[in-house]
Amino acid sequence: MTDLNTPESTSKPVWEHFDHVEPGIRRRIAVADPEIKEYLDGMLARIASHRGVEHPFLNAYRTTALDPEQERHLFSECYYFFRYLPFYITGMAVKTRDEMILREIILNVADEVGSDPTHSTLFADFLARIGIDKEHLDGYQPLEVTRQLNDGIRHLYTETSINKALGALYADETMSSIMVSKINDGLRNQGYDDDLRHFWQLHIDVEVGHSNSVFNAIAPYVGSKAARAEFEEGVFEFLGLVERYWDGVRELVGIGK
C-alpha cells in the first residue's frame, strides 16, 4: 500500500510514490522529453502541497476522534462529494478523438464500476457499518459548498476544453490519493479495524494509479505554454473548489480550526 502520510514517505519527492507503484496499479508511460515529466512532476508537487489537500481539517482528523454526530456530518458530506464523479469523468470522453485519452478515462471509470462489488457499493457498505443508511442520506441536506463542489466538478469535466478537464482530473486523482490516506488514518485513530476501512485502504493505491492514467493522457499535450495554461486552470479551479468544501466541513464538524 502506497501510504503518503508516513514520516518515511515525506522524506522523498512526492512524485516517486507515483513512479514506483504496487503490482496491478496503473503505471506512468515513459516520456521521451524529460522536461515534460519534470513539468508534470512539478505540478503534482504543487497539487500535493495545496491547502485543499493539506487542509487543516484533514490533518486534524488524522489524530482527533469524532463523536457520532460529527462523524455522520463528515461522511454524509463525503457521500454528496463522491457519488456522481464516475459519470462526470465519463463525460470527458466526448471532448476527444484521441484513443490514448479515451483509454485512460475508461480505465479510471472501470476501476470504479467495472467489477462487483462496485466502489460505490463498497462505500455504501462502509457508511452502513458506521450507522449512515440510505434513508438518512436521502433526507440529508448537504452544505452549499458541497453542492458548489459537485456542480463545479461536473462543469470542469463536461463543459470545458479537454486540456482543462484533464488538469482538473489530475488534481482530483492526485488529491484523492492523499485525502483517502488521511481519512484512513482518522478512521484508524477512531478505532476502526482494517475490514471496516477497506474502502479507504483500497483507494490509497487506486487513486495513485488514476493519477498516473491522467499523466499518460496529458503528457503528449503539455509541450506548449498555451496548453499548460489551460491545464493549470483546470488544476487550480478544482483545488479551489475542494479547499472551500473542506472549509465548510471544518465549520460543520468543528475541528481543525
Curated annotation (Swiss-Prot):
GO terms for molecular function: 4-chloro-allylglycine synthase activity; metal ion binding. Fe cation 2 binds at E112, E173, E207, H210. Disulfide bonds: none annotated. Disruption phenotype: Cells lacking this gene no longer produce detectable amounts of L-propargylglycine and L-beta-ethynylserine, that are terminal alkyne-containing amino acids produced by wild-type S.cattleya. Its cofactor is Fe(2+). Binds 2 Fe(2+) ions per subunit. It comes from the Bacteria. Its EC number is 1.14.99.-. Coiled coil: none annotated. Keywords: Amino-acid biosynthesis, Antibiotic biosynthesis, Iron, Metal-binding, Oxidoreductase, Plasmid. It catalyses: 4-chloro-L-lysine + AH2 + O2 = L-2-amino-4-chloropent-4-enoate + formaldehyde + A + NH4(+) + H2O. It holds the Pfam family Haem_oxygenas_2. It is an enzyme of class 1 (oxidoreductase). The keyword Amino-acid biosynthesis applies. InterPro entries: Alkyne_AA_Synthase, Haem_Oase-like_multi-hlx, PqqC-like. Fe cation 1 binds at E112, H119, H203. Pathway: Amino-acid metabolism; Antibiotic biosynthesis. GO terms for biological process: antibiotic biosynthetic process; L-beta-ethynylserine biosynthetic process; L-propargylglycine biosynthetic process. Involved in the biosynthesis of terminal alkyne-containing amino acids such as L-propargylglycine (Pra) and L-beta-ethynylserine, that are produced as antibiotics by S.cattleya. Catalyzes an oxidative C-C bond cleavage in 4-chloro-L-lysine to form 4-chloro-allyl-L-glycine (also named L-2-amino-4-chloropent-4-enoate), with release of formaldehyde and ammonia. Is also able to react with L-lysine directly to produce allylglycine in vitro. PANTHER family: 4-AMINOBENZOATE SYNTHASE, PQQC-LIKE PROTEIN. This is 4-chloro-allylglycine synthase.
